[in-house]
């Protein structure tokens, strides 16, 4: 289906995309955010939700979740002119009369200008690869942890052997009823000190085992079947929640279909963040230019310039002088 025209469509709902949407709202234009994941926030929200970030201006420290919550709260001021589309991957976009037609895996969208803020590309969790896994996902099977308290008093099973798996196991030790870590190797890939703490903890370690099947009722998993590597031994683990910590894969596979100049996995832009196609801009990690510093703070600075240039492109005859927010918001 093809929807109404928006002034600016932002591809990517991470920190840079969210701030760009806020600034566009500040400038009085309509905005649509298209995000490939099931939630906003990008890498800080998904990959390190509980870890501290120290390089955001005016915040000595804050977590990925806190950063995301603040940006969403900031954007909510303009919810009447902002539309958010989740679980949509942008496949192609084409120049049409009055703007661009954007085709995703779900729908066709129309926009007068586009700002690409998709970071290093769409990323997705590495799954167990088991039948019925998708049925349990986001019910009691999780690929990342946002709130540790949601696992209070539960039997939690964690699959994985990296830093995140070990960190979550240690963090949940005193919150959950029990924590069991399943890893396909005897050796863990996490920091040595963390592994030492894990081995000295009350967390149950099952190595080397691999997941073989999930059993449950409806949308809730109840048991994980695991098998010892190179042996016939099979165990069934009862669980209330299952955390799969195999990491995430990133991909800009659709970039080649966007007909834009790019280097490696980033889009080449001008000093005003214009891509090789007029009316399309790129910011954040998605943008490549000489001297680029890949920081969230850098992307925050790029967003207003890209938004202002997009507005100039859409409304060239309008008085587009930039006004400070103190003059616009009481």
Swiss-Prot record:
The record's free-text note on cofactor binding: Binds 1 FAD per subunit.
Keywords: FAD, Flavoprotein, NADP, Oxidoreductase
Gene3D superfamilies associated with the record: FAD/NAD(P)-binding domain
Coiled coil segments of this chain: none
Cofactor(s) demanded: FAD
EC number in record: 1.18.1.2
Matching InterPro entries: FAD/NAD-bd_sf, FAD/NAD-binding_dom, Fd--NADP_Rdtase_type_2, Ferredoxin-NADP_redctase_2
GO molecular function: ferredoxin-NADP+ reductase activity; flavin adenine dinucleotide binding; NADP binding
Positions bound to FAD: 35, 43, 48, 90, 123, 285, 326
Catalytic activity: 2 reduced [2Fe-2S]-[ferredoxin] + NADP(+) + H(+) = 2 oxidized [2Fe-2S]-[ferredoxin] + NADPH
Pfam short name (any one): Pyr_redox_2
Subunit structure: Homodimer.
HAMAP family membership: FENR2 (MF_01685)
Family statement drawn from the similarity comment of this UniProt entry: Belongs to the ferredoxin--NADP reductase type 2 family.
Protein name: Ferredoxin--NADP reductase
Organism classification: Bacteria, Bacillati, Bacillota, Bacilli, Lactobacillales
